[in-house]
């Protein structure tokens, strides 16, 4: 998988260009699982990203499935965390891989295979805060969550859930029909 891209328009041809190939790119991720933009505070965010090496000179090229990296505010080419910018990274602890994320009202909800996290912009010096919302309610696949006016709904490996500030199981008359015939070894 590739990391984030920018769409370049040239002679009526649209093409994607890797962030790491952009002029001035500094430690931009080279691989990642998911990319999104936190539009209110204007940060590019890549989930399941390759970390910066121990020397701090390059990306490793190997996905850390529990690492989230974010660019400097309103600057998609600057990914090196410095005291003079808002770039940085967060590591999740519950689960083995990030499965998906959605932008909600005041937060970005991030699911691992086992848990749900809330990621919120808090400003410098930490930029984003991450809070574990619930264990044992992971996401079954990258497209198994949706934001609605009634809350955020998703499918886990054992149930349907809704988040409205707290996590609740969704009453469902077809629950056994769906989950009694699912091969959990083939989930994301």
PLM regions with names:
Residues 16-19, 24, 60-67, 71-73, ...:
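Generic N-terminal initiation segments characterized by hydrophobic and/or small/turn-forming residues
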Residues 1-42, 50:
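Disordered, low-complexity "stalk" and linker segments at domain junctions of extracellular
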Residues 17-26, 83-92, 129-135:
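A short beta-strand motif characteristic of beta-propeller blades
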Residues 5-19, 75-84, 124-130, 168-171:
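Beta-strand initiation motifs
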Residues 1, 51, 92-188:
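Beta-sheet-dominated scaffold domains
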Residues 44-46, 75-86, 90-91, 110-111, ...:
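A structural signal for short, well-ordered beta-strand segments and their strand-loop junctions
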């Amino acid at each position: 998988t590739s990391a984030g891209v920018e769409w370049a328009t040239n002679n009526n041809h649209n093409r994607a260009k890797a962030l790491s190939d952009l002029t001035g790119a500094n430690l931009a991720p080279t691989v990642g699982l998911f990319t999104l933009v936190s539009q209110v505070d204007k940060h590019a965010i890549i989930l399941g990203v390759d970390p910066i090496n121990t020397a701090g000179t390059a990306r490793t090229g190997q996905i850390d499935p529990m690492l989230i990296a974010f660019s400097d505010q309103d600057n998609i080419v600057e990914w090196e965390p410095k005291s003079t910018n808002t770039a940085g990274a967060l590591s999740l602890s519950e689960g083995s891989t990030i499965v998906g994320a959605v932008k909600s009202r005041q937060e970005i909800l991030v699911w691992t295979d086992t848990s749900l996290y809330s990621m919120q912009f808090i400003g410098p010096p930490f930029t984003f805060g991450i809070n574990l919302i619930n264990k044992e309610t992971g996401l079954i696949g990258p497209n198994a969550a949706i934001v609605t006016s009634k809350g955020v709904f998703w499918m886990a490996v054992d149930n349907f859930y809704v988040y409205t500030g707290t996590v609740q199981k969704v009453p469902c008359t077809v629950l056994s029909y769906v989950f009694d015939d699912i091969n959990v070894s083939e989930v994301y």
